[in-house]
């Protein structure tokens, strides 16, 4: 059995993104013709603008989000989902590092 990592078959398909001086980092990719990112939010509070609608799934840890039209942050634990409309924005904060999957709808 070979446990060595294999090189990516198409390295151009992966895009590393760094936001907020490294406070949020993600890797972007396409699957079935749709864009996705998998990332980590470090402890802190961040604002994101959206071009496309987004579905955010928390995959590890906990994120707090203030969605468009809402006055307060709500907690989203691992395994939970929230959606953000296109051409809007949302705030997210983490008390400790948390991981997410973002699907562009």
Curated annotation (Swiss-Prot):
- What protein name applies here? Pyrimidine/purine nucleoside phosphorylase
Query: Which keywords does the record carry?
Result: Glycosyltransferase, Transferase
Q: Give the EC number(s) under which this enzyme is classified.
A: 2.4.2.1, 2.4.2.2
Catalysis: reaction(s): a purine D-ribonucleoside + phosphate = a purine nucleobase + alpha-D-ribose 1-phosphate; adenosine + phosphate = alpha-D-ribose 1-phosphate + adenine; cytidine + phosphate = cytosine + alpha-D-ribose 1-phosphate; guanosine + phosphate = alpha-D-ribose 1-phosphate + guanine
Q: Where is the signal peptide?
A: none
What family does the database annotate? Belongs to the nucleoside phosphorylase PpnP family.
Q: What organism is recorded for this protein?
A: Anaeromyxobacter sp. (strain Fw109-5)
Gene Ontology MF terms in the entry: guanosine phosphorylase activity; purine-nucleoside phosphorylase activity; thymidine phosphorylase activity; uridine phosphorylase activity
Which Gene Ontology terms of cellular component type are present? cytosol
Q: Which purpose does this protein serve, as stated in its record? A: Catalyzes the phosphorolysis of diverse nucleosides, yielding D-ribose 1-phosphate and the respective free bases. Can use uridine, adenosine, guanosine, cytidine, thymidine, inosine and xanthosine as substrates. Also catalyzes the reverse reactions.
Quote the gene name from the UniProt entry: ppnP
